[in-house]
C-alpha cells in the first residue's frame, strides 16, 4: 500500500513536471514568434490608426504628399535588416525623439505619439520597427533585451539624419518602454537628454 502511494506521487510529479516544461516551451514559442494573425501588418496599421485616431489621416496624408514621411534601413551587428520611418520637424530644430513601439506593434502604430512630438512639440522623430515586427527582419521578437542595441544604433542614425547637435529623447510604449529603460542602462552619447 505504501509502495503504491509512493509510485502514485512520483507519477503525478512526473506528469506535472512534463506539463510545466511543455507549457513553458509552448508559451515561449508563442510569445517570441507569434503567428501572422497576431503581428500588426503595415497594411492593416494605417486603417487601424485612422479609425482610432482620426486626426492622424490629414497629417499622414500631408506628410506623404510632400514626401516628408521617409523610410530608412540599417543592418544591425547580427546582420539583420531593420526599418524605421523618420520625419523632420516642421521648422529646423535640434530636438529629436526616437519613439519605440510595443509588443506585436510596428512603427506605424506609434504615429499618434509621433504626431504629439512632431506636430505639437516641433520635434524631429524616428520610429523604428523592432526585430520581427513591421518591415524589419528577424526570426523572433526580442522582448527589448537585444532591441536595446538596435535602438542605440537608431539613436546614432537619428543624430546623423537630423544633425550632429541633436537633443534627443527616447520614448517607448509597453515593450518599447521596457526597451527604452534597458537602453537607459547603457553608456549614452552626450546628445541623449532624457528617457
Language-model features: locations:
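N-terminal Sec-pathway targeting helices
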Residues: 1-17
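An N-terminal hydrophobic leader/cap segment in hydrolases
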Residues: 15-74
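A short loop-to-beta-strand scaffold at the N-terminal edge of the catalytic core in hydrolase folds
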Residues: 77-88
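Short beta-strand element of the alpha/beta-hydrolase
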Residues: 94-102
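The serine-hydrolase catalytic nucleophile loop
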Residues: 103-117
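Conserved alpha/beta-hydrolase
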Residues: 117-137
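Alpha/beta-hydrolase active-site loop
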Residues: 141-162
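Primarily recognizes the serine-hydrolase "nucleophile elbow" in alpha/beta-hydrolase
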Residues: 157-161, 166-195
Amino acid at each position: 500500500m505504501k509502495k503504491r502511494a509512493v509510485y502514485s506521487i512520483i507519477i503525478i510529479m512526473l506528469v506535472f513536471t512534463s506539463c510545466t516544461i511543455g507549457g513553458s516551451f509552448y508559451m515561449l514559442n508563442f510569445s517570441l514568434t507569434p503567428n501572422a494573425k497576431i503581428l500588426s501588418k503595415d497594411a492593416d496599421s494605417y486603417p487601424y490608426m485612422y479609425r482610432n485616431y482620426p486626426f492622424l489621416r490629414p497629417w499622414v496624408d500631408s506628410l506623404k504628399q510632400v514626401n516628408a514621411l521617409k523610410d530608412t534601413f540599417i543592418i544591425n551587428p547580427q546582420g539583420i535588416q531593420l526599418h524605421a520611418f523618420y520625419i523632420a520637424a516642421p521648422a529646423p530644430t535640434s530636438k529629436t525623439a526616437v519613439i519605440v513601439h510595443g509588443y506585436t506593434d510596428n512603427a506605424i502604430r506609434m504615429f499618434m505619439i509621433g504626431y504629439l512630438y512632431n506636430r505639437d512639440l516641433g520635434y524631429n522623430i524616428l520610429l523604428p520597427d523592432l526585430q520581427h515586427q513591421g518591415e524589419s527582419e528577424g526570426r523572433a521578437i526580442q522582448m527589448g533585451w537585444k532591441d536595446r542595441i538596435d535602438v542605440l544604433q537608431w539613436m546614432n542614425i537619428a543624430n546623423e539624419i537630423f544633425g550632429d547637435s541633436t537633443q534627443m529623447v527616447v520614448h517607448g510604449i509597453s515593450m518599447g518602454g521596457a526597451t527604452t529603460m534597458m537602453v537607459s542602462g547603457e553608456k549614452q552619447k552626450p546628445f541623449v537628454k532624457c528617457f
